[in-house]
Amino acid sequence: MSAHSLRILLLQACWALLHPRAPTAAALPLWTRGQPSSPSPLAYMLSLYRDPLPRADIIRSLQAQDVDVTGQNWTFTFDFSFLSQEEDLVWAELRLQLPGPMDIPTEGPLTIDIFHQAKGDPERDPADCLERIWMETFTVIPSQVTFASGSTVLEVTKPLSKWLKDPRALEKQVSSRAEKCWHQPYTPPVPVASTNVLMLYSNRPQEQRQLGGATLLWEAESSWRAQEGQLSVERGGWGRRQRRHHLPDRSQLCRRVKFQVDFNLIGWGSWIIYPKQYNAYRCEGECPNPVGEEFHPTNHAYIQSLLKRYQPHRVPSTCCAPVKTKPLSMLYVDNGRVLLEHHKDMIVEECGCL
């Protein structure tokens, strides 16, 4: 099996875990029954995966929690709990399973309401008040609705961009239960077609790009599956976070230590005027498995440390090495002239596992 085929199979497996199978036709809302099936979100994501030119750093597919299409008033509810760090939204679009242009009202603009609602806690009392947070209302004229790959597509970049730029704004929207909740007899929610999705294309902030580091580690730490792993540890399970607790003595972990350099000892003292000595620092110590964000790993180092945890005799540990350095200004003699020059990468500022 080729590496490309293996990656596709892994993506399919991840999708199956994250998105339950679509409901049967009898359970779908009336406006989706009996219609030709649209390409699944997985098929669309695979087409993006095969695209040789990535459109953004991160592409998310959010399945609708609830959809209500009544005439020209359309309401969509998604779980935006992933909004934990700032991102620059490049493009956002709703991809819906609608039969065709005849379902788009032509007498006026569509009113679109976007809500946030976290996925329900299975231990919650069904009679409890449900919380749904309004995020944005905007209008779309019929000419802005397009049809691509068997789906109805609505571009919604501008209304949602502020939420990714300031994820804390979502928390500020949480008001009193009286304002944001409604009490009603409990009825099971109507399943929503799994092909109704919100596609979000976003880039990491420029400062985060410049810092580099293991983007896979950030995703793993913020994912809902990582959060579930933490819960399993709290309940006595054996999860990823519990394994991380078995670390070497912190005093033996990768760190920066003093490293005094004397130019006279290496025979350079005759032409270097200043400094004659300086503290270059160096890195020493063990790297934990798996390695944490505080050790500034690359994606490759993070994956290597995970494999080392499960195959300790086959995979070598990552190495403690400089990840950030700074220059040293030196005054020295060159062909009878006195020069002042700044030489980069002379002093270790931070150590990490690579």
Swiss-Prot record:
This is Nodal. Keywords: Cleavage on pair of basic residues, Cytokine, Developmental protein, Disulfide bond, Glycoprotein, Growth factor, Secreted, Signal. One of its GO terms (molecular function) is cytokine activity. GO terms for cellular component: extracellular region; extracellular space. Belongs to the TGF-beta family. Residues 1-26 form the signal peptide. Residues 27-244 form a propeptide. PROSITE patterns: TGF_BETA_1, TGF_BETA_2. It is found in: Secreted. Disulfide bonds join C254-C320, C283-C351, C287-C353. Pfam families: TGF_beta (PF00019). InterPro entries: Cystine-knot_cytokine, TGF-b_C, TGF-beta-rel, TGFb_CS. It comes from Mus musculus. The keyword Signal applies. The lineage of its organism: Eukaryota, Metazoa, Chordata, Craniata, Vertebrata. Homodimer; disulfide-linked. PANTHER family: NODAL HOMOLOG (PTHR11848:SF159), TGF-BETA FAMILY (PTHR11848). SUPFAM superfamilies: Cystine-knot cytokines (SSF57501). Essential for mesoderm formation and axial patterning during embryonic development. Glycans are attached at N73. GO terms for biological process: anatomical structure formation involved in morphogenesis; anterior/posterior axis specification; anterior/posterior pattern specification; apoptotic signaling pathway; axial mesodermal cell fate specification; brain development; cell differentiation; cell fate commitment.
